[in-house]
């Protein structure tokens, strides 16, 4: 049987009798490749790569053989003579990994500072000392951040203003940063129970579902009043506070608190603790009811006050667009039917046309003997083919400049890439969309209608057109935008527990204008009495106070 197997022949092994390593004579004909320790080893090829590194194309190339002096040119003997190049050949430097760094004219920090100073002086001669100082202080786009470290690039370009000036007699109670708030959770929250329903709703005009870029509609100005009364000014909440609940608020106040971790701008909420009852209020100013524009964008509006594209002007524009759109898409008119709720509008006035608004007063059990009573709202109603009614929350997104940073031109992408447009809005207006979603969930709306409204001209902030509409189910939309309702309820419950442990009095919750944190202050009872008197004196000049009249 052994004859069937091939014989085993021992391989030839080199043996160096006079030293260590391979024999010198045996490796004479082995080809040798020069090696430099600056070469990157360990990567032979990558068949899955889609594109090469454009910045360092010679990252994996050898340091030897790249320059012209090592190149071989096959030429005829009679053409071997050539003139000497006095310019010199261009030396291709190998890819370096941080070794042998020496400061030079270009990378020396001192020279960078000197060049920056000379550049500022030159700009000052052209633009004047005022604009030059602003350029030196805040930089100019990418050029202003080019020579800064990575950790400084994401800092705000300028300090934001606080929504309220903290006085010296205010006592700090608590400071909670956003990472701690994001860890809170209050799961298994049940749907709120209806207590009282008030108001009348117009029916939705389904013709606006067919609006697109080729069939746009002009946005009209609707002369209707929307009341934005705070908690303690609501007659229904005053009546309910005598018999039920111990925490009272409105949906916009709750949404602001629940979505505080997504906010960048400063805001404040006043809290009054009277025994076992807690009232969440907003101050008598119009800023709380204003909609923000590009609040969470990497480059929020930075124009000066008075400009059409300043933060305040854009906020006013977005607020009026939202009001007009929410009424225009409804079937208005005396001959149109209305869906009336159990009780009339509590803010009804003689001779004043109110906007289509349905108020729903609901209560939630937050545990630990906490019963929340809040006023929520619907904007419209629609009837299904089977006869069922669906309540709507109607909101509008507005485009103010298609050429702005981190934006997509709606007139080109809205019909074909609506998902990309909405994704961009979620990135630039994450806080505003989250608050709209929370308000819809609290009210129990069946649909959240979003409208896309754009300026007729980028420089004209008074005329707008409707480019399209889109609808979502609030709970599903909350999942799409990564809005955790358990975390929202946990944040609210945490702040309520902190206030319950404090003595009776007035408190204020404020979002820090420049830090991701919420501060709680104990303030005097007459803290905002001067603001109230100023508001009453200038009530004729305000665009809207407790009511928004467009």
Curated annotation (Swiss-Prot):
Q: What is the lineage of its organism?
A: Eukaryota, Metazoa, Ecdysozoa, Arthropoda, Hexapoda
Keywords from UniProt, A to Z, are: Cytoplasm, Initiation factor, Phosphoprotein, Protein biosynthesis, RNA-binding
Its subcellular locations are: Cytoplasm
Q: What is known of its domains?
A: The RNA gate region regulates mRNA cap recognition to prevent promiscuous mRNA-binding before assembly of eif3d into the full eukaryotic translation initiation factor 3 (eIF-3) complex.
Gene (name only): eIF3d2
Sequence segments annotated as region (RNA gate): 287-301
What is this protein identified as?
Eukaryotic translation initiation factor 3 subunit D-2
Spell out the family assignment given in the record's similarity comment.
Belongs to the eIF-3 subunit D family.
HAMAP family given for it? eIF3d
